[in-house]
Amino acid sequence: MSIAALIDHTLLAPDVTAQHIRTLCREAVDHGFATVCVSPTRVRLAADELAGHAPRVCSVIGFPSGAHLSEIRAAETKAAVNDGADEIDMVINVGAVKDDDWDTVESDISAVVDAAGMAIVKVILEVSELTDEEITRACQAAERCGADFVKTSTGYSRHGATAEAVSLMRRTVGDRLGVKASGGIRTHNDVATMLRAGATRIGASAGVALLVDEEAL
């Protein structure tokens, strides 16, 4: 099976234009990517572009800092779903994790899960900022709150996915949740490493290049 069906084809830079989104969606259709992952303000355009096609629309929430109130996250999630988002990638409040304030962490996740309705929710942990114990507890919090996936990174922190973090996340959630690896995944070998570690979804802005790399093997 091609890796395309596992890839969230991602474009989250602040200077993204409507034409960039149209190109992203066309690439997703042409190559069979799982989703396009875009900012909330671009969800409606992406949903219109992908109407009648297989790739789904994923929106980030509380991105990239995670320093957002629960009610703001909920409102942002509802707006994204109303605009056509099928999947939601939310960022946890890393500062709350560091404060050992798990009530806030879980309140944020629950607010998004409740607002998302039937949409898939992925919880971004920002693993580069967390200890192994914090990664484990964050995964457990995501599962308790009803999330569907845990995800490594925003791509805006010190580093992205590592095989060690993905493996720890997989051991923690078992087969009950999906694991999405993202951040710094640029080659087919990177993808293979993450899949072996336990990832079931890949987030990448270099999706097309990954397929070219796959074909060259």
UniProtKB/Swiss-Prot annotation:
Any one GO biological process: carbohydrate catabolic process
EC numbers, comma separated: 4.1.2.4
UniProt pathway: Carbohydrate degradation; 2-deoxy-D-ribose 1-phosphate degradation; D-glyceraldehyde 3-phosphate and acetaldehyde from 2-deoxy-alpha-D-ribose 1-phosphate: step 2/2
Active-site residues annotated for this sequence: 89 (proton donor/acceptor), 151 (schiff-base intermediate with acetaldehyde), 180 (proton donor/acceptor)
InterPro entries: Aldolase_TIM (IPR013785), DeoC (IPR011343), DeoC/FbaB/LacD_aldolase (IPR002915), DeoC_typeI (IPR028581)
Primary localization class, coarse: cytoplasm
Subcellular location: Cytoplasm
Any Pfam family hit: DeoC
Leading EC class: lyase
Keywords attached to this entry: Cytoplasm, Lyase, Schiff base
Protein's name in the database: Deoxyribose-phosphate aldolase 1
Species of the source: Cutibacterium acnes (strain DSM 16379 / KPA171202) (Propionibacterium acnes)
Native organism taxonomy: Bacteria, Bacillati, Actinomycetota, Actinomycetes, Propionibacteriales
